[in-house]
Amino acid sequence: YIEIKNAGKTFLQNGETFRALDCVSLSIEKGEFICLLGPSGCGKSTLLNAIAGFSPVNEGCIKIDGMEVTKPSTENVTIFQNYGLLPWRTVLKNVQLGLEAKKVSKTERKEIAEKYLELVGLSEFKTSYPRQLSGGMQQRVAIARALAVDPEIIFMDEPFGALDAITRMKLQDDILRISKDQKKTIIFVTHDIEEAIYLADRIVVMTPNPGRVKKVVEVKLQQSRDRTSDDFLELRDKIF
């Protein structure tokens, strides 16, 4: 479904060429949950932005459904760490944003937005404004907004990185449940090994300078994942 072949990405920095990605090759199936895992500066966000079309590769190629990626697609959405909510809009109106761009009727927009707010457990906050919500709740609104447009692929760039540990674990449970129910293709950037094991079908482990794929680890755990199980801890040690 997503084919990455010998992908490379270079930038000019202070007159010198900086190589962010080097010879990255990877195949991703439709409906897979893929985590890009590695330390800061290993190119995982660069790779995510290249697949999403925000900053295409300048070596090799990336194809989605046989089409080369040269720009962002309206079929896909990206969820960032900073939520990206509009402060002057209510929660309900924020979730409707992508639907407005797709020219969905007012009545249908409201119905769809309410459905996804219910899915993320925020129905009672639909008339609230982002400033009235906690960080975790704001990220739930961002997730509802992403799902409302029924995207083909959801890109998530360290979406829970700014949250406290307990809120992060709750949102991991939410996104795992949603990914199983909605069967979306999700590409998720993280530097947290346990988060990657908890969420992913496969983990792409990356190394820095330049960003390369070190190995791809299949996560063969039960659907109900237990962070304290022997299998989980064994996999963590294997990746580490």
Residue ranges and their predicted role:
Residues 37-39:
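The feature captures the beta-strand-to-loop junction immediately N-terminal to the Walker
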Residues 52:
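Helix-to-loop junction immediately C-terminal to a conserved catalytic motif
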Residues 60-72:
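Conserved ABC transporter NBD signature motif
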Residues 79, 143:
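Hydrophobic anchor residue at the start of the ABC signature
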Residues 96, 107-124, 177:
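Conserved ABC ATPase "signature" region
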Residues 128-131, 149:
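Conserved signature/switch motifs of ABC ATPase nucleotide-binding domains
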Residues 154-157:
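Catalytic Walker B motif of ABC-type/P-loop ATPase nucleotide-binding domains
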